[in-house]
Every structure is written in C-alpha cells, then in structure tokens.
C-alpha cells in the first residue's frame, strides 16, 4: 500500500543470502497487480560479469559477493533506457556456463509500470547513483527468528539462513553441505561489507522468518548434513547444526502452502524460480 501511495519508478529489494528475496519479490508482484500497478521484476543476478571476468578475493578465490562482480555500466545503461521509455533486450545469467546470455526477453515500461529490482546489492546507492531517491522505494528482507531454545540460549539469526542455503544448494545447485559450509566465511564477509552497511537505506524492513520453519527444514537438512565426512573441517559445523535440529519435531511438508516463502528452499512452490 505504501508503494501504491508513493508510486515510485523503482522498488529495490535487498537482504543477506537466503533471506527469501526472490519469493518476496514474486509475492509483492501479485500485491502490486491488485493495487493497479504493473510490476516488472528483474534480478540483479542476471547482470553478473562472465565468470572469467569475476574478481578474486585476497585468497585468490572467485568473489561473487562483491559489487564489482556485477557489470555495473551495462546495468545502469539498461535501467536508464527503461526509465527513458526505451525497449531493452534483457540478459539472463547462465550459472552453468558462467556467462550472460540473451534469449529474446524484451522489456519496455508502460505508464503504470514499476521496476522491481531484487538482489544482494539493491540498496547500495552506487548501483544507480543518478536516479533521484524520491523515485525509489527500498525494502530490506532478512530472516530474524523470534524463538529461543530456552531463556538463556538464543538462536543466531544466521542459523536459519544457513539451513535454508544448505537445503536449497543441495536440491537446486548441486552443492553438498560440505561445500555450502565451506563457502560460509566468504558469504559472511560479503554480507558484512556489501549488505549490512546499507540496510538503513531501506524504507521498510521485512522479517521473512517463519516460526515453524526449523521443524520443516529438519526433515530436509538432516540427511544432507549427515553426508559431511567426519575427517573434514566442515564436520564441526555440520554436527552442531544436526544437534540443534534435534530440538524440533518435524512437520509434514503437505502442511506448507505452495505460496509460502519456505517453498523457495524446500521445493514445491507455485512460483517459478
């Protein structure tokens, strides 16, 4: 309703890894249609540079978290063309090939259209420095769980996102729990440098945590985490998560509606990703 009242030209959606940005943007799209606004949802992931051009971190590893992993000049040009009423040929990033491809996706904004841009760096002013702030509406999404184990032991907000990521990466990206856990330090460094400093830019903050989701993730995460070999350094974290999940009784997946944000990670969503 705030977006319908303000009528911005661009809605930015950002948040840390596995916060549910993609499903949030799709559900927001439906609500905007109800409010008589035509949303055009774009993912900033489609504007990554080709993998061979991806910057490397201090350890020589590919750094996908930095804003410099995006083709900012190309992104800015397309956004300005859209705002000027021009038609653009939208890219799609092929993660398998590690390169940007063009599949004939054309877009031209209509009078009642609004761009909805979702991505890790969406709240960073550097991505579109020439666009007036009054023309934008910024949303920060994160999973801030409100439950504790007891009166003395709180649940880190990073745990819920890590479990989401372990399940999603195994099901849809072909990564083992060992590989996902091994990438955690890089992901966390990226969030601390490129996401958290800009959360105060947001007009609205949305908590995507669900009170029942540990009980749902348990059934999916336990067998995946159990595959982590005992001799590797990632085993300690996998074992900690397995011990933590013992506190929860699993919930049958059939109880979770297909439009639930949790479906982005466990599957069975009515949305296309």
What are these regions (language model features)?
Residues 5, 76-134, 181-198, 270:
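Glycine-rich phosphate-binding loop used to anchor ATP phosphates in small-molecule kinases
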Residues 11-13:
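Hydrophobic anchor at the beta1->P-loop junction of P-loop NTPases
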Residues 18:
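Walker A (P-loop) phosphate-binding loop of P-loop NTPases
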Residues 21:
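Conserved lysine of the Walker
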Residues 30-40:
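Post-Walker A helix-loop "phosphate-sensing" segment adjacent to the P-loop in P-loop NTPases
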Residues 125-273:
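Conserved NTP phosphate-binding and transfer environment spanning the P-loop NTPase/kinase superfamily
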């Amino acid at each position: 309703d705030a977006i319908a009242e303000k009528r911005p030209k661009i809605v930015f959606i950002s948040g840390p890894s596995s916060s549910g940005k993609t499903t949030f943007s799709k559900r927001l799209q439906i609500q905007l249609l109800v409010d008589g606004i035509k949303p055009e949802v774009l993912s900033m992931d489609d504007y990554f540079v080709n993998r061979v051009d991806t910057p490397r971190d201090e350890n020589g590893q590919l750094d996908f978290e930095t804003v410099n992993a995006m083709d900012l000049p190309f992104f800015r040009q397309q956004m300005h063309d859209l705002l000027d009423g021009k038609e653009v040929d939208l890219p799609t990033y092929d993660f398998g090939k590690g390169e940007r491809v063009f599949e004939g996706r054309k877009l031209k904004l209509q009078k009642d259209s609004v761009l909805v841009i979702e991505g890790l760096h969406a709240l960073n002013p550097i991505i579109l420095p020439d666009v007036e702030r009054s023309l934008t509406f910024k949303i920060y999404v994160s999973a801030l769980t409100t439950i504790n184990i007891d009166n003395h032991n709180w649940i880190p907000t990073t745990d819920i996102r890590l479990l989401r990521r372990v399940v999603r990466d195994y099901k849809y990206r072909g990564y083992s729990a060992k590989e996902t856990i091994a990438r955690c330090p890089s992901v966390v460094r990226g969030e601390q440098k490129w996401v958290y400093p800009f959360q105060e830019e947001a007009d609205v903050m949305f908590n995507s945590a669900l009170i029942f989701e540990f009980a749902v993730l348990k059934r999916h995460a336990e067998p995946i985490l159990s595959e982590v070999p005992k001799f590797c350094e990632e085993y300690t974290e996998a074992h900690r998560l397995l011990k933590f999940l013992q506190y929860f009784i699993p919930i049958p997946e059939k109880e979770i509606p297909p439009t639930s944000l949790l479906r982005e990670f466990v599957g069975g969503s009515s949305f296309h990703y």
